[in-house]
């Protein structure tokens, strides 16, 4: 092979025009073209051996005239002819690209004529390196009939669709014989159809391997030099030629030459070797474990004896075969034989053999199809082919998988690897077929562990196969066991080069001069993207990414052979602390959307993770924008960041709806793995305006802003009390005061109830369940506090007692101090008032205004020149006060700089100056200090400079006061507008300067040419005039008289030529500046204004955070008294350093939680995230597109079944007409066909109506997709496995549910649970085991068992002594878990109230939000309405109260008096119930003979007072109980969602 053997010869991309550049004779070098000629050869006959029956033709198939004289002479006297001795090799003369004339839309197909003994590896090199084909994940070798044959229309359609689908979804190559006949033509037509439907961009690689000697029009392909580019190939066959045309729909051709002509089958051996060589090529994957040998599968369609021989040879090489039964000849014979095989044990091995009863029939078919000659050999090969059941699969059009022939092809390979589930998984991964993995690999029988899934998981991560990663996480893979430091580093080492993060990693590696990526490099890059406040734990956590990494590296160096095992053991002993977060960050940095989503959904702390992802993606998008070559990546990154921002807001919304208080705790808790930042800080860092604008954040900021003062405290009260502290007590209202008043009102209310209840005699109702409250500890309050309504009016606020949730309060954390509620003493009130950010703000505003007035007074009235002879240099005392005031402001700015979170001063400065106001502060203070220094010089000019600087500096101090307006909702956004317009103006000035300077220079050069009498000799005047006059002219001061030379004394003498040219230049200049540029500036300002105005509310809310954060951390006093606060801070710092060894944390907007509290909060947040994810999935599945797609799938299924029936009916009719009773049979068939047509017409009309209904009524946003056919068809009652068992129901399609529909093959599974068969008192006798069966009193009251057997749905049918489910078949007979045959009556009390927040009753979409008492079932952990079975002799009303008490209220040891009080309140509630539903329940426990029916009654606590002080506590029958929001997005047990929907409609509530 030449030195240029890896130089690409063919570009597999868009080739219809690219070949002109790449393969034209002018561009393609001679050396590249000759590579093929040097490495591939053809064969020519060198010995003419005449045929016995035709002496004019050689045994090679060519006539005498096509042989050389030497060949004619050497063949004289010879009778034997063979390829080895009678042919010789020559460089190939047929290669290039075929352009099929008349097929202009087709891409040109590369082709090559080669010898039959060519090295197969050389062919693979040609395809991969020269023709640039991608390594396939599968090779489908199609074989069969070489001559034209007819397929049934439906089989032809299935074959075409399935073959192309298999190739496209797996990235497969299809190999055929390449000619335009037989099975090859069917394959070509399938490809053509696919390209017509989806365009030529979706090309499938179809490789034709044909015999050169049978190809028609060989001369069109031959070129003695440099190949043909293109080779024009006409599809008109040559008259009289016995060969075949090449198929124009193939993409590549190999023409195998053994020197013969007209001989078929020459290519078989070469094709087999090529396929064998392909199997040794590894598939393309970033993971070594993900690279497998390319699998090959044989697809057999029709065919003759050679087809059977091909199957035989390939199956011996362990290539599985798929036979299309019903396609004719060989395929049908093999299919028939396969369907009549039995298993037999031979020499300890189980093999398939043809059933002896059918051997003669199979032999007869072989003779019938192939003829008697060679029948025994063919039969023997068929027997051998069928022996290994794993290696052969028969696809039947009428079989169970007839709808998906692609699955049959792929499952054949899985079947061949049945003994190795890991190999099967690798195949599914390579094909990216998640459907196969779910249905055939991850089954109940196969158990998976982290160890077996680790390699596949690494492949899924590296190859961005998110669905597989999700599947692995759901089926036994533990991320904690899987992820090690070694794998994490490998993930970052394999980051694709086209990502934004790759250059950043390489840059950091270059700085450190390292060749491999370690986590310290990654941590540095993450810190760079996150900003100076963030400190990655990859860098600071020395245990996991420092000491452990070094220890592991040392072990690897010492024990190279077992390094993987050592690292795995280390990972088991001491796993990484946050594996999900680690891999999630990698996926985000690689911008892998679906993978990031999967890992985010599975990980912890979803809100913080989403916000961090948003920040990282936005920063990477900003970096990408700086590179103009990757702007598309930038937009994609921004869109990805927006998705995570939406997810963070969604999780926060769920948390807030569930519990307002805990949601605010989530916002301010310290997160260890996020550099001890809070979710609020991460949101600000990510500039997430939507997140900060959320109600939860804004309520929290309001609470922090007001401190412990009531939220409605007016500013003037604060202003008065700042200077008259004694008025704090009468006019300032504090939050703890409200709490204590509310608690006092509760106690009074309880006292009055106790007094009334003491007059009532103790009594106990017969059937009432005990309902009593429970004493709550702080821990229990943490779960139930927000779920209990408070006694009072409808508009009262909920309790906000953070110490109930966060009991660990530390003195140095002012955040916790602010949010605590405790009784305030005299000093506490004063301290809390002055430490509130709002009070600090008012004090600072007043102080700053006083400072401005003092500054103005000094500058305007008392700023004398410094005189050393006078006392204090003659400086006025007010000026000294001003100096001291500025000094205190400077000290405060230094304190703010030192208090910034970053550790290093450089990072502190960076964070400090990220706030524009801080830059203004430092600039104005620096200028002030310069002015004061100059002020003390006695030189008059220096003093004047000092006075001027000081006078100008006041501008910046006054402008600084604009920050005061940021607290206002209307004026705050205006400041943002001004800031953004200043940025626009800076860019505009650059453009304006170009025009101004250009015009100024031209104008001056025209008016005052130099040198000469009109030249100006003053350089400074010349320079200033170049800028001065154009600038003022822009504002309307045109200087017309001056530029026209009418004022020579003032302006100077103007050159005569300039007098007429200057006005013309001015006119042009004014057009550009005043008309074009200034209007452009106005348009830019207008756009900025509209953009900010649209989100003005969000902008203001986002600004609030900075304001609250600044004043939350400020000392109590404003300058100049702030110095006292600094002294106190210093004293405290010294005290803590001496006592504890570390400085105080200072005043922060954070809450520190104990590990146990963090765990509880994490679990609660994770549950809220799961709810949000479920709602999003419901929303997506409820879209019109998804519903139409699902409906389309079902229509396809129905269509397939109907076609199958029609085919069967057609066959029956044809058979009947040829039978002796043809007339009668014909009439019967006609009648059935007529009925079928009627049914088809009816189905078509129904489908059209369904589609119209879907289009007219799209789903309401956020509304759940509640099954409309709940009353028509049962779904959960047909689900498998049956609850509490492994029993699976008989499959019943929707159209077969009705008992009226004939279903002769219906064989329901008989199942009754052992607990029911034990014959408890609540169960009937087992009628299924009795013969004859005794008749129970169905459809009436059973007085013997004291059970009502009347159905709420009316009379039900009784057959063979058993009742039939009125809703239809369920696939199971017996009773399952139900005790009674027939209806089993239940009672479901739906106890509701209005959901309240601190602002009153919650509203959604203008409607009130309901919440109901929900219990978590112990058997399946699903949430449900509390309810249960109606016991024998029990009334429904009694059952409602009893079930509510048993499942929602615990049996607690409280006083009898308290029991009576609670019982009375429950009695009041249950006296006002409204029936919601009465009838059948779609319950998974239902069977054909036993089913659930219920009565659902709504008991509504409208004012919220009945449950105000009653605690919900799960009983023995429930795992948990809580108040749950009524929403269609919440998954509930059985048909409870539809019941709640009825409640919401009745109450006109949101759903």
Swiss-Prot record:
Record: residues binding Ca(2+): 893, 896, 918, 921
Phenotype upon changing residue 908 to N: Severe reduction in ADP-ribose-mediated channel activation
Intervals of motif Nudix box: 1428-1449
A GO biological-process term: sodium ion transmembrane transport
Intramembrane positions: 715-730, 1019-1034, 1117-1135
Motif (Prevents fast channel inactivation): 1040-1042
Region entry Disordered, spans: 744-767
Residues in the Cytoplasmic compartment per record: 1-714, 731-837, 899-916, 969-980, 1081-1116, 1136-1551
Superkingdom of origin organism: Eukaryota
InterPro entries in alphabetical order: Ion_trans_dom, NUDIX_hydrolase-like_dom_sf, NUDIX_hydrolase_dom, TRPM, TRPM_SLOG
Extracellular side: 859-877, 938-947, 1002-1018, 1035-1059
One GO CC annotation: plasma membrane
Coiled coil, from the record: 1184-1209
Family: Belongs to the transient receptor (TC 1.A.4) family. LTrpC subfamily. TRPM2 sub-subfamily.
Subunit structure, interactors included: Homotetramer.
PANTHER family: TRANSIENT RECEPTOR POTENTIAL CATION CHANNEL SUBFAMILY M MEMBER-LIKE 2, TRANSIENT RECEPTOR POTENTIAL CATION CHANNEL, SUBFAMILY M, MEMBER 6
Protein name as catalogued: Transient receptor potential cation channel subfamily M member-like 2
Species annotation: Nematostella vectensis (Starlet sea anemone)
């Amino acid at each position: 092979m030449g030195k240029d053997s890896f130089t690409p010869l063919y570009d597999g991309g868009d080739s219809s025009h690219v070949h002109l550049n790449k393969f034209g004779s002018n561009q393609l070098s001679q050396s590249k073209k000759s590579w093929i000629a040097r490495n591939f050869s053809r064969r020519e006959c060198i010995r003419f051996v005449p045929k016995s029956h035709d002496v004019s033709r050689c045994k090679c198939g060519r006539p005498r005239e096509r042989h050389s004289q030497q060949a004619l002479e050497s063949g004289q006297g010879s009778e034997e002819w063979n390829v080895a001795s009678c042919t010789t090799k020559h460089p190939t003369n047929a290669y290039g690209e075929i352009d099929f004339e008349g097929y202009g839309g087709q891409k040109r197909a590369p082709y090559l004529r080669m010898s039959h003994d060519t090295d197969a590896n050389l062919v693979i090199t040609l395809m991969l390196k020269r023709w640039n084909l991608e390594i396939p994940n599968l090779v489908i070798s199609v074989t069969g009939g070489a001559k034209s044959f007819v397929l049934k229309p439906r089989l032809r359609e299935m074959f075409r669709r399935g073959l192309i689908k298999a190739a496209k979804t797996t990235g497969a190559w299809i190999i055929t014989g390449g000619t335009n006949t037989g099975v090859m033509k069917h394959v070509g037509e399938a490809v053509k159809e696919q390209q017509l439907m989806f365009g030529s961009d979706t090309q499938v690689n179809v490789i034709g391997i044909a015999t050169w000697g049978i190809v028609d029009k060989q001369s069109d392909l031959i070129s003695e030099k440099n190949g043909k580019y293109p080779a024009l190939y006409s599809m008109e066959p040559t008259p009289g030629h016995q060969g075949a045309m090449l198929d124009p729909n193939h993409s590549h051709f190999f023409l195998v030459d053994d020197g013969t002509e007209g001989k078929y089958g020459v290519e078989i051996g070469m094709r087999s070797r090529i396929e064998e060589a392909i199997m040794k090529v590894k598939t393309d994957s970033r993971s070594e474990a993900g690279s497998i040998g390319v699998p090959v599968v044989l697809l057999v369609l029709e065919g003759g004896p050679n087809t059977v021989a091909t199957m035989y040879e390939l199956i011996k090489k362990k290539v599985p075969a798929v036979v299309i039964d019903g396609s004719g000849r060989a395929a049908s014979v093999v299919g028939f034989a396969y369907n009549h095989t039995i298993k037999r044990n031979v020499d300890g091995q189980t093999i398939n053999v043809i059933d002896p009863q059918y051997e003669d029939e199979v032999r007869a078919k072989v003779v019938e199809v192939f003829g008697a000659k060679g029948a025994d050999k063919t039969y023997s090969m068929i027997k051998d082919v069928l022996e290994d059941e794993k290696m052969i699969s028969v696809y039947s059009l009428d079989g169970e998988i007839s709808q998906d022939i692609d699955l049959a092809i792929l499952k054949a390979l899985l079947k061949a690897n049945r003994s190795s589930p890991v190999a099967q998984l690798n195949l599914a991964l390579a094909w990216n077929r998640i459907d196969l993995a779910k249905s055939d690999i991850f089954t109940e029988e196969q158990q998976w562990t982290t160890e077996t899934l680790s390699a596949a998981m690494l492949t899924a991560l590296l190859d961005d196969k998110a669905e597989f990663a999700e599947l692995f996480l759901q089926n036994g893979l533990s991320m904690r066991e899987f992820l090690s430091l070694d794998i994490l580093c490998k993930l970052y080492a394999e980051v694709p080069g086209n990502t934004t993060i790759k250059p950043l990693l390489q840059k950091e590696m270059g700085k450190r001069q390292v060749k491999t990526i370690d986590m310290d490099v990654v941590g540095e890059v993450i810190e760079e993207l996150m900003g100076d406040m963030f400190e990655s734990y990859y860098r600071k956590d020395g245990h996991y990414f420092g000491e452990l990494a070094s220890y592991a590296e040392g072990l690897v160096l010492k024990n190279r052979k077992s390094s993987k095992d050592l690292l795995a053991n280390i990972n088991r002993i001491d796993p990484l602390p946050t594996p999900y977060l680690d891999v999630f960050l990698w996926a985000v940095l690689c911008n892998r959307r679906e993978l990031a989503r999967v890992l985010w959904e599975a990980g912890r702390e979803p809100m913080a993770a989403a916000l961090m992802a948003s920040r990282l993606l936005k920063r990477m998008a900003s970096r990408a924008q700086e590179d103009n070559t990757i702007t598309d990546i930038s937009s994609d990154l921004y869109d990805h960041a927006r998705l995570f921002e939406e997810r963070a807001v969604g999780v926060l919304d769920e948390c807030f709806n569930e519990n307002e208080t805990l949601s605010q705790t989530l916002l301010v808790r310290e997160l260890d793995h996020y550099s001890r930042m809070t979710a609020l800080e991460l949101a600000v860092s990510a500039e997430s305006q939507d997140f900060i604008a959320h109600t939860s954040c804004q309520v929290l900021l309001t609470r922090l802003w007001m401190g412990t003062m009531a939220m409605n405290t007016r500013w003037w009260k604060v202003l008065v009390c700042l200077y008259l502290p004694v008025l704090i007590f009468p006019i300032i209202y504090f939050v703890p005061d409200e709490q204590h008043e509310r608690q006092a009102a509760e106690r009074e209310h309880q006292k009055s109830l106790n007094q009334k209840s003491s007059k009532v005699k103790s009594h106990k109702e017969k059937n009432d369940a005990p309902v009593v409250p429970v004493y709550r500890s702080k821990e229990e309050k943490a779960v139930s506090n927000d779920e209990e309504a408070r006694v009072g009016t409808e508009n009262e606020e909920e309790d906000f007692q953070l110490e109930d949730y966060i009991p660990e309060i530390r003195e140095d954390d002012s955040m916790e101090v602010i949010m605590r509620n405790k009784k305030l003493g005299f000093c506490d009130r004063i301290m809390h008032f002055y430490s509130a950010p709002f009070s600090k703000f008012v004090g600072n505003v007043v102080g700053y205004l006083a400072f401005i007035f003092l500054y103005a007074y000094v500058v305007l009235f008392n700023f004398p020149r410094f005189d050393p002879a006078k006392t204090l240099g003659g400086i006025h005392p007010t000026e000294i006060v001003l100096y001291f005031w500025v000094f205190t402001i400077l000290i405060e700015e230094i304190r703010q700089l030192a208090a910034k979170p970053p550790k290093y001063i450089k990072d502190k400065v960076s964070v400090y100056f990220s706030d524009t106001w801080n830059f203004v502060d430092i600039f104005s203070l620096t200028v002030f200090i310069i002015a004061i220094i100059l002020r003390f010089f006695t030189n008059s000019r220096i003093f004047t400079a000092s006075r001027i600087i000081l006078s100008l500096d006041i501008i910046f101090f006054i402008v600084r006061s604009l920050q005061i307006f940021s607290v206002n909702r209307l004026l705050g956004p205006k400041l943002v507008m001004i800031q953004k317009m200043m940025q626009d103006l800076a860019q505009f000035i650059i453009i304006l300067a170009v025009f101004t300077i250009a015009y100024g220079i031209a104008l001056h050069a025209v008016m005052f040419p130099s040198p000469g009498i009109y030249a100006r000799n003053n350089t400074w005047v010349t320079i200033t005039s170049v800028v001065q006059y154009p600038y003022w002219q822009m504002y309307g001061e045109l200087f017309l008289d001056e530029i026209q030379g009418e004022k020579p004394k003032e302006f100077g003498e103007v050159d005569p030529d300039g007098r007429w040219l200057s006005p013309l230049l001015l006119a042009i200049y004014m057009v550009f500046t005043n008309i074009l540029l200034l209007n452009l500036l106005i348009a830019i300002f207008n756009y900025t204004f509209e953009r900010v105005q649209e989100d003005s509310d969000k902008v203001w809310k986002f600004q609030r955070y900075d304001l609250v954060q600044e004043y939350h951390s400020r000392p109590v006093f404003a300058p100049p008294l702030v110095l006292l606060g600094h002294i106190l801070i210093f004293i405290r710092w010294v005290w803590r350093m001496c006592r504890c060894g570390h400085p105080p944390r200072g005043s922060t907007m954070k809450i520190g939680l104990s590990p146990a509290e963090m765990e509880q909060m994490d679990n609660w947040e994770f549950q809220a995230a799961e709810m949000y994810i479920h709602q999003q999935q419901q929303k997506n599945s409820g879209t019109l597109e998804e519903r139409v797609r699902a409906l389309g799938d079902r229509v396809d299924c129905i269509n397939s079944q109907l076609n199958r029936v029609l085919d069967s009916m057609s066959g029956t009719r044809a058979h009947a007409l040829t039978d002796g009773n043809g007339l009668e049979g014909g009439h019967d068939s006609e009648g059935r066909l007529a009925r079928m047509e009627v049914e088809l017409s009816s189905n078509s009309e129904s489908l059209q109506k369904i589609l119209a209904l879907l289009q007219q009524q799209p789903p309401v946003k956020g509304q759940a997709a509640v099954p409309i056919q709940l009353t028509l068809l049962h779904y959960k009652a047909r689900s498998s496995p049956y609850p509490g068992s492994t029993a699976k129901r008989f499959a019943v399609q929707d159209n077969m549910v009705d008992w009226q529909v004939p279903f002769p093959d219906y064989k329901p599974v008989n199942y009754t649970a052992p607990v029911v068969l034990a014959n408890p008192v609540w169960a009937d006798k087992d009628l299924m085991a009795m013969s004859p069966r005794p008749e129970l009193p169905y459809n009436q009251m059973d007085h013997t068992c004291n059970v009502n057997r009347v159905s709420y749905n009316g009379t039900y049918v009784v057959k063979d002594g058993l009742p039939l489910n009125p809703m239809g078949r369920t696939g199971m007979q017996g009773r399952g878990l139900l005790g009674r045959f027939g209806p089993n009556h239940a009672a479901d009390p739906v106890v509701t109230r209005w959901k309240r927040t601190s602002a009153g009753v919650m509203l959604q979409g203008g409607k009130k939000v309901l919440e109901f008492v929900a219990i978590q079932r112990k058997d399946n952990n699903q949430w449900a309405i509390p309810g249960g079975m109606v016991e024998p002799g029990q009334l429904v009303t009694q059952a409602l109260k009893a079930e509510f008490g048993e499942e929602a209220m615990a049996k607690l040891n409280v006083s009898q008096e308290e029991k009576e009080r609670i019982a009375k309140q429950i009695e009041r509630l249950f006296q006002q119930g409204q029936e919601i539903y009465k009838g059948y329940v779609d319950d998974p426990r239902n069977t054909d003979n036993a089913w659930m029916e219920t009565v659902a009654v709504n008991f509504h606590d409208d004012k919220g007072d009945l449950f105000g002080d009653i605690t919900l506590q799960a009983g023995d029958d429930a795992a948990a109980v809580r108040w749950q929001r009524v929403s269609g997005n919440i998954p509930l047990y059985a048909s409870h969602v539809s019941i709640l929907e009825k409640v919401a409609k009745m109450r006109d509530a949101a759903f």
